């Protein structure tokens, strides 16, 4: 019982919470006992001495006696109870660092108001889920009724008492629906015939003739209906049966006696027939669709677009035929085909980020020339629908046997204990408010559907049938059930395409109760995890505590779920679910509210009507708690652009019901975004949120369903190319000069555990050396003692997709003090590269891990992934939007997570390009001095947290720290492009400016590109194929940190390092301190260099919030070395005044076929907001033979 638990026994509190409580106590000898995190049934005794916490493990033996784990040679003492152990060690000099003196009591605030947690459900009977309790009384009910006791010894009185009891029960029932003759027959049976049947039983007979007579009378009409219905059903069955069964031929119906046995047989036959008919119709329809319609599940879709020819906009039509794998270009919708391109000839889709309806398509002609075609769609949704259809086409006709990308639908809905409407297909089509899918994508089925419900009144089979039927209606496909798991009325269902059935394995389900006293299942979470080929996926559906004032309780709910939900690989015991999965999706009714005074309810309603969501999101509890790193640490959420999903009046979406009369008074439920979808993925893996919104036409609940769809990168079950039995010993992973910084007061030694699926088993290191850090932190250095890791497969296609999980553990208790993740997708092999990951434990930030890594792989290269097919070019307008992936309100901009780092070039293998990674600089460091945002919008990296004090190494692979605002690059290196991610805000992608000659293609619309790497803005990097010269000062001190943020030039003002296209203009650059706007010369190629930040002079102070406007550099500043202009192509020779020869740089490793497409002039829309079809620039279709590029 709780009352008997000693005050010093804190149960399952975390280690960090124990340290906090002891530090708060502040007295030497303060102590508490908590459950061990590493050994079941064991405890940890925590003692404070000289501001350090010492932890002793209390172990049970086979006889359930307790002992404190001691060093070798120290005698062990056993105690039958914990109380006896504590009393013993209160004596001095018993072996502890100090004797136990001051027990730290339990915090009782949670227990005081815990029963009120679900008051709303308890006090609102209509909202309770219905129960299928039989109306007829059972034995328990009969015992509750008083029995007459006048003469208990008379047997006939006993029979009369039973009769009277049943009569009373019949009278208490609602019999208004019974026919009068049926009711009279039942009463007659109870009055006389019940006793006669009783006499039959006493004689040993098993028959109840009078009861049979009663049921025959009641079923008389039913018998006639069955006799009349059966022939019709048999005829219908034969109609759909392909092979006639002799047993089902029509036979003459002989009127039989309406007795119960006959009725049961007939009803059984009727039930069997109905089931058989349904199965046969389903089979017939399925076979018919397979043979006739299956190949046209996705019909051809035509898009009306605009294209320019000689500056004149022309209307065009793009027809996408997914099934035949063709993109058809027509001048009129119903006209003949002008030309078409097969899926193999469509090389790249490049989305403009400045103009969200503009798209560039790179296609290959029959003469092996690369053609760049630019189109403007009617809106951004049409462009997204077109891209999804093209991606589906590439995927459908891919020569790869296994997918490297899947799409996932996530849906969450609090059903309000009401059955759903008949039609819920808008939910699965992502239709309604917010970021929704275009109609053209309706026919594209997702690979996996995950549906989470709360307050779900239906049974599992009933709900599953509704879901499968709705998806069948939407996709014409029957989905396989992967898992279904229910806790109380919290449920999660996972469905997958039939073709993925053999790719899904290791399915695991679990639940955690967080309701009253953490025992009742009125609140909590359910989860499902599984492997999709080589990728681990996890899904959590939670229903957290309600009530605006119970924010801290919700935070605790989240922590409990995080800690105790057992999903995924059991070998990863040191890690919770945030590190066990490549992709983790968290959905549900999280119940976080808009925290505003109740008297502002009507003002909130008006802001919702005016769609001023950002004003309300500034007070959203979940966003504020995430900003403070209290919950969902390192999770991401798409920008919210839909109305609050709670609390509506039922059967309408036009009115919020924000008041509710309770027994305790008026309760306010201000409109809030209670229903959310968040996710967390390993570093350097592809994940893009394609839609996030709520439906508008499903109104049976006071919540609206919420949908989110994702592209997620997956890996295959890789088989080594060395063949069976071959020894793959070329690969090696080496960690060097690693150290961890921990936020702890514990006095103990630490070691590392390294886990990965690319290792045969986990690896344990030697103990590190402890040092005193800043602000009470502890620094643990591992130096050169870490073991070298031997991967099971060293092929780069496999190894570079892997991750290493790191856990730093105490040598005394084997408890983890922090966990992190390092990606092996390195820029180059055979070199030491910096690495970084934040360390977390039970959802709290506990420190950082830094060091260097050296990766050795076998020969090979990375193949192109499907998600590389769609890229996004960046321009300056995107900088102002890219902090909107959390919300659009200003308070969040200081905390916005950056995108994932791109996959970078591998000098000896192949270039790895992925547009959805964290911004990384040279050798994994942030791109210092090459900021893409203004100072107040500096993107942080993976960890989302404050800039660590020691940034000498810079972030490396994995969850990096915030990008320092200004540090010189080591050497020029190519930039990779960014892809569309989170709507208008892609993940920032910055790659190392290291190897000479590797440069990014210009994103100018007419300009042919090197593969899909699109950068047009000098803020983001060089777009010339020529190397960038680095100032001597930067070469001499590549790792010097500077506090000043880099300047962010105005669109019309060139940076000191912007190269002009002509020689005389270059001289002007050297002689001026304030640069004039860059002139745009017709078709003349415009050459750009990297934006330089070689010194701190002329830089704005770190606190400047000038939104990227630069200060003029000092006049004494040395001129920046300038790259030579590009030699124009032959098609442009006639338009240039003075050709300037220049030596060609080394060819990039990847896609040399389109290198020279960088040499033509494109349009520049940075200085105006005019759309491309307004006729200011020339047509940008240029052809260039591949042979000319060698």
Curated annotation (Swiss-Prot):
The keyword Phosphoprotein applies. It is found in: Cytoplasm; Cell membrane; Membrane raft; Cytoplasm, Cytoskeleton. Keywords: Apoptosis, Cell membrane, Cytoplasm, Cytoskeleton, Hydrolase, Immunity, Lipid metabolism, Membrane, Phosphoprotein, Repeat, SH2 domain, SH3-binding. Tyrosine phosphorylated by the members of the SRC family after exposure to a diverse array of extracellular stimuli such as cytokines, growth factors, antibodies, chemokines, integrin ligands and hypertonic and oxidative stress. Phosphorylated upon IgG receptor FCGR2B-binding. GO terms for biological process: apoptotic process; determination of adult lifespan; immunoglobulin mediated immune response; intracellular signal transduction; negative regulation of B cell activation; negative regulation of B cell proliferation; negative regulation of bone resorption; negative regulation of granulocyte differentiation. A motif (SH3-binding 2) lies at residues 969-974. Activated upon translocation to the sites of synthesis of PtdIns(3,4,5)P3 in the membrane. A motif (NPXY motif 2) lies at residues 1017-1020. PROSITE patterns: SH2. Residues 989-998, 1031-1045, 1161-1183 have a biased composition (Basic and acidic residues). Its EC number is 3.1.3.86, 3.1.3.56, 3.1.3.36. GO terms for cellular component: actin filament; cortical cytoskeleton; cytoplasm; cytosol; membrane raft; plasma membrane. InterPro entries: Endo/exonu/phosph_ase_sf (IPR036691), IPPc (IPR000300), SH2 (IPR000980), SH2_dom_sf (IPR036860). The SH2 domain interacts with tyrosine phosphorylated forms of proteins such as SHC1 or PTPN11/SHP-2. It competes with that of GRB2 for binding to phosphorylated SHC1 to inhibit the Ras pathway. It is also required for tyrosine phosphorylation. PANTHER family: PHOSPHATIDYLINOSITOL 3,4,5-TRISPHOSPHATE 5-PHOSPHATASE 1 (PTHR46051:SF3), SH2 DOMAIN-CONTAINING PROTEIN (PTHR46051). Phosphatidylinositol (PtdIns) phosphatase that specifically hydrolyzes the 5-phosphate of phosphatidylinositol-3,4,5-trisphosphate (PtdIns(3,4,5)P3) to produce PtdIns(3,4)P2, thereby negatively regulating the PI3K (phosphoinositide 3-kinase) pathways. Also able to hydrolyze the 5-phosphate of phosphatidylinositol-4,5-bisphosphate (PtdIns(4,5)P3) and inositol 1,3,4,5-tetrakisphosphate. Acts as a negative regulator of B-cell antigen receptor signaling. Interacts with tyrosine phosphorylated forms of SHC1. Interacts with tyrosine phosphorylated form of DOK1. Interacts with tyrosine phosphorylated form of DOK3. Interacts with tyrosine phosphorylated form of SLAMF1/CD150. Interacts with PTPN11/SHP-2 in response to IL-3. Interacts with receptor EPOR. Interacts with receptors MS4A2/FCER1B and FCER1G. Interacts with receptors FCGR2B and FCGR3. Interacts with receptor FCGR2A, leading to regulate gene expression during the phagocytic process. Interacts with GRB2. Interacts with PLCG1. Interacts with tyrosine kinases SRC and TEC. Belongs to the inositol 1,4,5-trisphosphate 5-phosphatase family. This is Phosphatidylinositol 3,4,5-trisphosphate 5-phosphatase 1. The gene is Inpp5d.
